[in-house]
Regions:
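Transmembrane alpha-helical segments of polytopic membrane transport and secretion proteins
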Residues: 1-40, 151-153, 323-334
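Helix-terminus/capping and membrane-interface signal
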Residues: 43-49, 128, 320
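Hydrophobic alpha-helical transmembrane segments of membrane transport/permease proteins
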Residues: 44-92, 108, 112, 186-204
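An internal, D/E-rich "acidic patch" concept
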Residues: 24-26, 84-141
Length: 334
C-alpha cells in the first residue's frame, strides 16, 4: 500500500513551488525593465544629437537682431558661449553640460539659464498637463465603458457623436469658443491668467486641453470593451450569474486596458505639444510661452533645451508605459 502524503508536507511543497514561480516571474520582469531602460539610452542620444545639430545649422543667430554690435563685442559673446569653436567641440561641450544636468544658457534672457527659467515655468505646465491627462484617462474610459454597455442604443450614438466632434475640432478652435461661452457670455469662469493655479483659472485650459483625448480614449475603450465583452470567458461569467459591475471590474477591464495603455504614450506627447497653444491662448506662464518666445527671438539655447527635455520626458514615459503594458499582459515580458 503506498504511503500517505502528509498534508503539511504537501502544503509546504505547494508553497515552495509558488514561491519559486514568483521569484522566476520577478526575475523575468526585472530583466524586461533593465532591457527597456537600456534601449532608451541610444534613443536619447540620437534625440540630443539631431536636436543639437539642427539648431546649430539653422540660419540666423540669436545675436543678429542686436544693433550696432562691434566685431570685438560679437567675438567676445561668441567666445563666452563657445560659438566660435568647431561644431564637434560645441557638441561635446553641450554633452558635458547635459551630463551635469545643465541645459545651457538662454540667449534671450541673458541673466538666466534654461534650468532657472524651467524651474519657474515647468511646475505650471506640469500641473496643467497632469490634470488634463488625469481627466482624459478617467472620463474617457468611463464614457467608453458606458457606450460599450449600451451598444447601438441612442446613448451610445450620442456619446460617440460627441466624441467624434471632440476629436475633429482642434484645441485652438475649441479654446476661443469655450472662452466666448463661459467667460464672455455666461461670465462663469475667467478668460485667462493663472492666479497661482487657482481652481477657476484651471477649468477652461484643462478642459480645452483634455477634451480631444477624452474623446479618443472613449472611442478606444468602447471598441476594446465590446470585444472583451463578447469573449467566451465573459459569457461564462454571465452564465454564472455574476453582477455586471463585478464582471467589468474583475474580468473585462484588465484586457480592455491594453489598447488604452498603448494610446497613452501619444496622448502624453499630444498634451505636451498642445499645452504650447493653450498656454498662449489663456496667458498661462508655462513652458509653452518660453517655447514661443524662444522661437520668435531665435533663442536656440532655450529651444534646444526645451526640445531635449520634452523628448527625454516622452522617452521615459513611453518606457514606463511599456513596463505597465508588461504588467497587464505578462506575455510581453518573454
Amino acid at each position: 500500500m503506498p504511503a500517505a502524503i502528509h498534508p503539511i508536507s504537501a502544503s509546504g511543497q505547494l508553497c515552495f513551488h509558488e514561491s519559486g514561480m514568483f521569484r522566476q516571474d520577478s526575475l523575468i520582469m526585472l530583466k524586461f525593465i533593465i532591457k527597456r531602460i537600456c534601449a532608451s539610452i541610444p534613443t536619447m542620444l540620437v534625440l540630443i544629437t539631431v536636436s543639437f545639430f539642427l539648431m546649430r545649422l539653422a540660419p540666423g543667430s540669436p545675436f543678429t537682431g542686436e544693433r550696432n554690435l562691434p566685431p570685438a563685442v560679437m567675438a567676445n559673446i561668441e567666445a563666452k558661449y563657445h560659438l566660435n569653436d568647431p561644431m564637434y567641440l560645441q557638441y561635446f561641450h553641450y554633452l558635458k553640460q547635459l551630463a551635469q544636468g545643465d541645459l545651457g544658457p538662454s540667449f534671450k534672457y541673458k541673466d538666466f539659464s534654461v534650468n532657472e527659467l524651467l524651474a519657474q515655468s515647468l511646475p505650471v505646465s506640469a500641473e496643467l498637463g497632469f490634470y488634463a491627462f488625469l481627466i482624459a484617462a478617467i472620463f474617457g474610459m468611463f464614457i467608453g465603458i458606458i457606450a460599450a454597455l449600451k451598444q447601438n442604443s441612442w446613448l451610445d450614438y450620442s456619446l460617440m457623436s460627441g466624441a467624434m466632434t471632440g476629436i475633429v475640432v482642434p484645441s485652438f478652435v475649441m479654446a476661443p469658443v469655450l472662452v466666448l461661452v463661459f467667460a464672455v457670455r455666461l461670465q462663469w469662469l475667467p478668460a485667462g491668467g493663472w492666479n497661482d493655479g487657482g481652481l477657476m483659472n484651471l477649468i477652461l485650459p484643462v478642459v480645452t486641453l483634455s477634451i480631444g483625448y477624452v474623446s479618443s480614449i472613449a472611442r478606444i475603450t468602447r471598441g476594446a470593451m465590446i470585444e472583451v465583452l463578447n469573449s467566451p470567458f465573459i459569457r461564462t461569467a454571465r452564465a454564472k450569474g455574476l453582477p455586471m459591475s463585478r464582471i467589468i471590474l474583475r474580468h473585462a477591464l484588465r484586457p480592455a486596458m491594453l489598447p488604452i495603455v498603448s494610446f497613452l504614450g501619444p496622448a502624453f506627447v499630444g498634451i505636451i505639444t498642445g499645452s504650447i497653444v493653450i498656454e498662449n491662448v489663456f496667458g498661462i506662464p508655462g513652458v509653452g510661452q518660453l517655447f514661443v518666445n524662444g522661437a520668435l527671438n531665435r533663442d536656440y539655447g532655450m529651444i534646444l533645451g526645451l526640445t531635449i527635455l520634452v523628448g527625454i520626458m516622452t522617452i521615459l514615459f513611453n518606457a514606463i508605459l511599456d513596463i505597465l503594458y508588461a504588467i497587464i499582459d505578462p506575455k510581453i515580458r518573454y
